[in-house]
């Protein structure tokens, strides 16, 4: 696979190969194996987000009336590879230098291998041993030329990441039928998981010779950093499935893990599950229109550990070989494993010859002792602390509707609708946590958890208003923001839905998938920067004749009245001014559009950069033709099909930037409800050919 992305000189290549097989060693012993290998390479993966080396950052600050060809050539004459042309601002790099010189090459090799042996001990017992190895080698580089905004003397970084995970299992299974229609399938086993991450980085902060990206070209001592994470989890588990005449089913499971990443006194944790289902149509006489009526209920627990080295003080290596520094995250020698408990009840009903099927589920989930690194006051000497954060609840509904409206000899229309609604709530926080627990912060928006709220609550400064909702304006004619941050909305939507329609006529199949969500909020730093610079459509008000808020400075009557100087365009911000007696009067103070929008859309003002995240997408359209056996009879093919497809074709939303289905990256975590320097979601179209021999 070769992918050329929407930006010049970016993209990647990928090659995947898989081999699998089974060997019957004897009548009782068989061996299965499977190996897959993936190679992925890119000469340049683009930098994204709100950073000076991303094209989105350049486009935010670039003047819209500037011809990009003015940035050619990239370098000042006589100072090639040393001084890039930055004709309009030193804060943004030359876009051609960003795309063709500030490179991020990468090459990755990944393998997943599995081998298992199955031994039939008797008619009722089987024994299996299995081992699976997942291994990755990732080689990355960063090239930054001289006169880079962040690295004026150039920069080169070489990073090698080795990662593997080895899982070894033993499993004894039992299966039998007894009494009258009772079947039992049971198993008991053990697993040992070992993983290692070894990340080695070397960097040259400053280059002797321009354009030569080698560690030997470092202008000073090479910055060295190595991170090694080792982890082991030992487990024992059991499962049992009991069925009575295919009418009544009972499933039970249990597992105990011992994790090396947890404190010694808490490193063992047990979790289990129980589920039952009953087919009422097999027990009772139902109307002939009902083909199946199934009720189910389940209770399940899932345990979870964390990353290594959070239980004691471990010194961190610095950029210089042989030196260490104090950790920035406060360790915890007494935290507990995370446990999630889930309850679910559901119903599956199929009617009219399976032409109308409904599946409904209600679930309730409670997670306690979530392990996270919570921000803390830097004056303590630490920026974060490892804690058990408290208890979080999720509850909701899921509904799936499948129906066939039309069916004839040559034509079939199948429709599937999915709808889900989830409500998140924080029930308690750690005793050591503040009343408002900061989860993440990007731009002016803070994701804050508090009891009674959600883990997606967005907080920030808002416009200060009167009790009847009018915006308060100060004496200079600019809107006033609140003194403290306040709750502005939740990132999570009210509900999500999808609708798939498939139209099949003879050998042709047309599939159309729509999906979307209703509700949720998203804060955009891109909108803030565009608004401050007058590059969004919303800032045309007050700048063009005929638009709201527009006041012409050429109106001599206003000038003679001393309200504003001659020339230019002005805005009188809608709102009221507070009087000394506590009353309010309408604002009459004109300000320039540049000053007004610079204050109104500032990054810290979360309310004015917050939007509804509802959307509807045409997720996929696919037209496929399947060749008949008769058409293939003179070929070596057993089956063949060809399809035209398009993915992410359209998005209907009121969100003014690109795609509301996004999040911002903060320290390796995706923060919902926040956008920072994103690029447009790509639309893809292609042809797919599938053949079998």
Regions found by a protein language model. Give the residues of each.
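Surface-exposed loop/interface segments of Gram-negative outer-membrane beta-barrel transport/assembly proteins
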Residues: 6-10, 20-110, 130-234, 261-263, ...
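Alpha-helical scaffolds flanking conserved acidic
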Residues: 12-14, 292-293, 638-643
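Conserved C-terminal beta-signal and adjacent last beta-strands/turns
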Residues: 414, 490-518, 605-652, 675-693
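Residues on the lipid-exposed face of transmembrane beta-strands in outer-membrane beta-barrel proteins
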Residues: 19-23, 115-119, 168-174, 188, ...
């Amino acid at each position: 696979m070769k992918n050329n992305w929407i930006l010049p000189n970016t993209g990647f290549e990928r090659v995947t190969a898989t081999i699998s097989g089974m060997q019957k060693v004897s009548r009782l012993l068989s061996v299965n194996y499977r190996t897959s290998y993936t190679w992925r390479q890119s000469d340049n993966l683009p930098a994204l987000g709100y950073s000076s080396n991303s094209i989105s950052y350049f486009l935010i600050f670039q003047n819209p009336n500037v011809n990009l060809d003015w940035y050619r050539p990239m370098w000042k004459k006589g100072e090639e590879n040393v001084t890039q042309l930055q004709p309009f601002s030193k804060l943004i790099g030359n876009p051609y230098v960003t795309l063709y010189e500030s490179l991020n090459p990468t090459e990755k090799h990944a393998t997943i291998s599995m081998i298992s042996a199955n031994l039939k001990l008797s008619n009722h017992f089987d024994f299996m041993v299995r081992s699976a190895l997942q291994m990755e080698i990732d080689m990355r580089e960063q090239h930054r030329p001289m006169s880079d905004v962040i690295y004026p003397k150039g920069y080169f970084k070489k990073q090698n990441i080795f990662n593997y995970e080895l899982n070894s299992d033993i499993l004894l299974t039992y299966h039998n039928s007894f009494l009258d229609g009772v079947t039992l399938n049971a198993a008991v086993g053990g697993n040992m998981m070992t993983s290692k991450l070894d990340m080695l980085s070397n960097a040259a902060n400053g280059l002797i010779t321009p354009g030569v990206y080698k560690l030997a070209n470092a202008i000073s001592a090479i910055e060295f950093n190595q991170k090694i994470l080792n982890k082991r989890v030992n487990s024992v588990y059991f499962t049992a499935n009991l069925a009575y005449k295919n009418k009544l089913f009972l499933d039970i499971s249990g597992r105990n893990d011992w994790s090396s990443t947890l404190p010694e006194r808490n490193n063992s944790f047990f979790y289990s599950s129980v589920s039952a289902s009953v087919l009422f149509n097999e027990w009772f006489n139902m109307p002939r229109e009902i083909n199946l009526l199934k009720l189910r209920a389940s209770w399940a627990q899932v345990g979870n550990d964390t990353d290594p080295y959070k239980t004691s003080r471990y010194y961190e290596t610095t950029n210089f070989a042989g030196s260490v520094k104090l950790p920035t995250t406060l360790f915890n020698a007494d935290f507990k494993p995370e446990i999630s408990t889930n309850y679910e009840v559901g119903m599956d009903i199929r009617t009219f010859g399976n032409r109308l099927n409904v599946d409904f589920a209600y679930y309730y989930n409670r997670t306690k002792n979530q392990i996270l690194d919570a921000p803390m006051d830097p004056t303590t000497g630490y920026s974060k602390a490892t804690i058990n954060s408290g208890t979080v609840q999720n509850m909701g509904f899921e509904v799936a509707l499948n129906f066939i409206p039309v069916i004839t000899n040559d034509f079939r229309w199948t429709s599937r609708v999915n709808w889900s609604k989830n409500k998140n709530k924080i029930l308690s926080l750690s005793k050591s946590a503040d009343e408002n627990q900061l989860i993440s912060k990007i731009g002016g928006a803070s994701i804050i958890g508090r009891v009674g709220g959600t883990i997606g609550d967005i907080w920030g400064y808002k416009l200060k208003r009167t009790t009847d909702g009018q915006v308060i304006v100060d004496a200079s004619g600019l809107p006033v923001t609140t003194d403290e941050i306040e709750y502005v909305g939740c990132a999570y939507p009210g509900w999500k839905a999808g609708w798939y329609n498939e139209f099949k006529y003879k050998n042709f199949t047309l599939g159309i998938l729509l999906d979307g969500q209703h509700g949720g909020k998203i804060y955009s730093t891109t909108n803030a920067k565009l608004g401050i610079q007058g590059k969004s459509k919303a800032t045309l008000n007050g700048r063009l004749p005929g638009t709201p808020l527009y006041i012409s400075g050429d109106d001599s009557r206003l000038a003679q009245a001393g309200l504003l100087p001659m020339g230019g365009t002005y805005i009188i911000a809608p709102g009221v001014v507070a009087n000394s007696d506590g009353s309010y009067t309408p604002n009459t103070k004109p300000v320039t559009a540049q000053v007004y929008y610079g204050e109104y859309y500032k990054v810290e003002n979360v309310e004015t950069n917050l939007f509804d995240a509802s959307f509807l997408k045409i997720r996929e359209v696919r037209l496929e033709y399947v060749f008949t056996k008769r058409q293939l009879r003179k070929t070596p093919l057993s089956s063949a099909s060809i399809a035209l497809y398009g993915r992410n074709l359209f998005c209907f939303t009121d969100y003014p930037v690109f795609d509301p289905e996004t999040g911002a990256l903060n320290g390796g975590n995706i923060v919902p409800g926040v956008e920072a320097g994103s690029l447009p979601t790509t639309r893809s179209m292609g042809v797919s050919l599938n053949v079998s021999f």
